[in-house]
Amino acid sequence: MALTLRVLCPDQNVFDGQADEVILPSTTGQLGVLPGHVSLLTALDVGVLRMRDGNQWTAIALMGGFAEVDDDEVSVLVNAAEPASGINAEEAQKQLSEAEQAWSKFDGQPNSPDKIKAQQAFQKARARLQATKAN
């Protein structure tokens, strides 16, 4: 028995298929879902969704949203998502370094809109790079 997984963004259907196991980046930590899981609704953080089909793991970088688990169906609604297969690891590493440098300029400063944007850019860049290493 497998899970039906759907990953949806406002502008595209990123994934619609079967998986034996799904690991979600919830706001309270990693959340593993197997067939027969209890129904739930959870907020998702910026991070990496991992799904297993047999012995093959696949990753998708998620940019925050929500997930619903109900009757062996996992519906993931996110602001943006990018399959690891479409991410260039070298470019992702470069973007992470740039985002980290931009965010570090705000060390010790109180929160401001610019500091929060820099932190979000860092989190997104980190998720993209992690997705490339998750396969």
Swiss-Prot record:
Which InterPro entries does the protein's record reference? ATP_synth_F1_dsu/esu, ATP_synth_F1_dsu/esu_N, ATP_synth_F1_esu_C, ATPsynth_dsu/esu_N
Annotated protein name in UniProt: ATP synthase epsilon chain
Give start-end ranges for the coiled-coil region(s): none
Q: Which SUPFAM superfamilies match?
A: Epsilon subunit of F1F0-ATP synthase N-terminal domain (SSF51344)
The task this protein performs is described as: Produces ATP from ADP in the presence of a proton gradient across the membrane.
A Pfam family assignment: ATP-synt_DE
Organism field:
Synechococcus sp. (strain RCC307)
Q: Oligomeric state and partners?
A: F-type ATPases have 2 components, CF(1) - the catalytic core - and CF(0) - the membrane proton channel. CF(1) has five subunits: alpha(3), beta(3), gamma(1), delta(1), epsilon(1). CF(0) has three main subunits: a, b and c.
Q: Which NCBIfam families match?
A: ATP_synt_epsi (TIGR01216)
Recorded GO terms, molecular function?
Answer: ATP binding; proton-transporting ATP synthase activity, rotational mechanism
A Gene Ontology cellular-component term: proton-transporting ATP synthase complex
The protein's UniProt keywords, in alphabetical order, are: ATP synthesis, CF(1), Hydrogen ion transport, Ion transport, Membrane, Thylakoid, Transport
Q: What are the top taxonomic ranks of the organism?
A: Bacteria, Bacillati, Cyanobacteriota, Cyanophyceae, Synechococcales
Q: Does the keyword Thylakoid apply?
A: yes
Q: How does it sit in the membrane?
A: Peripheral membrane protein
Gene3D superfamilies from the UniProt entry: F0F1 ATP synthase delta/epsilon subunit, N-terminal, Helix hairpin bin
Give the region (Disordered) as residue ranges: 91-122
Q: PANTHER family recorded for this chain?
A: ATP SYNTHASE DELTA/EPSILON CHAIN, ATP SYNTHASE EPSILON CHAIN, CHLOROPLASTIC
Main location (coarse class): membrane
The similarity annotation says: Belongs to the ATPase epsilon chain family.
Where is the signal peptide, in residue numbers? none
**Where found, per UniProt?**
Cellular thylakoid membrane
